[in-house]
């Protein structure tokens, strides 16, 4: 099989790299930052942690499929999925909500 370079280590790139590796390719992932995950990051300041990426997993079936097809244990064995309803709430300065 071929040698493949994946540029970036965001969620989509890592999923592609995993699928390519399972298919038998030699995959190297290149990321310019010190961590992987793309927009899924966390930073700490003054003792508080801030998540900078998505807090929701809108299509869990896609991730379940990725775990199955890359030979991992089921997604739910690694991550606790909790139904969120509503997924967002917008409160304005005057107290009204949308």
Model-found features: residue ranges?
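N-terminal glycine-rich phosphate/pyrophosphate-binding loop and immediately adjacent elements
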Residues: 2-98
